[in-house]
């Protein structure tokens, strides 16, 4: 009789814990904002860089139109600038001042808003002068338009691929 009561009580606690787990979303399961995803991409850029100083987000271009799926790659375009913080300190770049006459890079590619996925395909080119900057921005916008067009076609293509044996 005592074991039945203990088992029933344990079952109730298990049910409560299960319901609590379903109701309270975990922090890792929540989608990132567009800006947060770009900041993660900048962090990744700093991790993979062999340069002496950290880079920090200087300018973020307009986000793409809203897409409900956080796992879908989103086209992104942003500019980073070299800071005064040396890379080995691993200080958060947001706390670092921009370096006077520091390098500026224009970055394009795709990111996902799903925090469990790493940023995808980010390429950065150093900006040399104002004239080149304008040309680079034009190229960047063209690349983003192409990426956006390709991403629009992915769901219909994937949906038309037969997955079963027959």
Curated annotation (Swiss-Prot):
Residues 30-129 form a propeptide. It is found in: Secreted. The keyword Iron does not apply. InterPro entries: Cathelicidin-like (IPR001894), Cathelicidin_CS (IPR018216), Cystatin_sf (IPR046350). Residues 1-29 form the signal peptide. GO terms for molecular function: lipopolysaccharide binding. Keywords: Antibiotic, Antimicrobial, Disulfide bond, Secreted, Signal. It holds the Pfam family Cathelicidins. Gene3D superfamilies: 3.10.450.10. GO terms for biological process: antimicrobial humoral immune response mediated by antimicrobial peptide; defense response to Gram-negative bacterium; defense response to Gram-positive bacterium; innate immune response. One of its GO terms (cellular component) is extracellular space. The keyword Signal applies. Disulfide bonds join 85-96, 107-124. PROSITE patterns: CATHELICIDINS_1, CATHELICIDINS_2. Exerts antimicrobial activity against both Gram-positive and negative bacteria. Its activity appears to be mediated by its ability to damage bacterial membranes. Belongs to the cathelicidin family. This is Antibacterial peptide PMAP-36. It comes from Sus scrofa.
């Amino acid at each position: 009789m005592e074991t039945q009561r203990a088992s029933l009580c344990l079952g109730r606690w298990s049910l409560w814990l299960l319901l609590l787990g379903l109701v309270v979303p975990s922090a890792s399961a929540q989608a990132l904002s567009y800006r947060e995803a770009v900041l993660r991409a900048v962090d990744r850029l700093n991790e993979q860089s062999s340069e002496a100083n950290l880079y920090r987000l200087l300018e973020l271009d307009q986000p793409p139109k809203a897409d409900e799926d956080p796992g879908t790659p989103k086209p992104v375009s942003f500019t980073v600038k070299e800071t005064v913080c040396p890379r080995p300190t691993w200080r958060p770049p947001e706390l670092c001042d921009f370096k006077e006459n520091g390098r500026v890079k224009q970055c394009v590619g795709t990111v996902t808003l799903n925090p469990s996925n790493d940023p995808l395909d980010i390429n950065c080119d150093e900006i040399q002068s104002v004239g080149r900057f304008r040309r680079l921005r034009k190229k960047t916008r063209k690349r983003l338009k192409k990426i956006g067009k390709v991403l629009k076609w992915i769901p219909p293509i994937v949906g038309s691929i037969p997955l079963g044996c027959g």
